[in-house]
Amino acid sequence: MRFTKIASVFWLVTGFALPPVIANTSATANNNLGPAKLSVYVAKKAGKSTAKGRSKTKHRAARKSQGPAREESFEEVFPPGHKFTPDEKAEASTLGTYFANAMWKDAYKLSTKSVKQHPERWWLHAARAAAAANLNRPKDVIDAVDSAIRTNNGDANRGNLTELKVLKANALSRMGQKSTAISTFLEAASTSPRDPYSRAGAAWIYATAADAQIRKGATAVTLATEAARLSHEKDATILDVLAAAYAEQGNFALAQKWEGKAILSGDSDDIPYYQHRLGYYQANKPWRENSK
């Protein structure tokens, strides 16, 4: 549904340009995250897109130790049937500005204050979760996601719920709760049969977890292959996951093939991380979340 008089709604992130999970911006700090995805909810004002003329905010998670993340421009996805009050429009517009400019502390502060005043507004909880993820506050991410899901009362669509669950899964992974993170990724995948990032998130953990009891190479390959198919083999971060999955299986030829494709199609900022992993595969070594 499209609203023509709202300036800007909110951003729901599942992966972030930060240092792991995706939320820590150093290249070495992101060893335990899975994939991430950024979705921005933006309305139109006076029939004209607010995204026009705005520089695209990029959120990457293909750091040295992380899994996939989609780089995405502003996208119009609105809660079906929701009627925004003037007060909500003002909050959404301010949050939209903060997210567009990566002002995560301001977004977190405002959303935290706002949910105390209006705990029934699920999209404020979702915005708080996104901001918390970018500030590397996984416990707050989980709390905010649970609150958003609990209070949406059917207002959130399937895409909203999928992204919330992926966001929570990444936070769980960040906290070292790998098995629970996998379960949450798979729950997100069942919510949206066509979402590649939930599948890639689970595949990343199955392929790269430090705990051998968690790793399942065959399952990782199956999930990563499906994620690659759903993304038409055009998302370098997912191809990177597929490479890690094959490496865990011991198929280093295919690991090199897919990592090479990730390098060819990846963003220039991410390529060094792909190249580093490729070096492991060329040496017949799988990638681990604690690899150096």
Enumerate the predicted regions with their spans.
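Short coil turns that delineate tetratricopeptide repeat
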Residues: 85, 119, 153, 159, ...
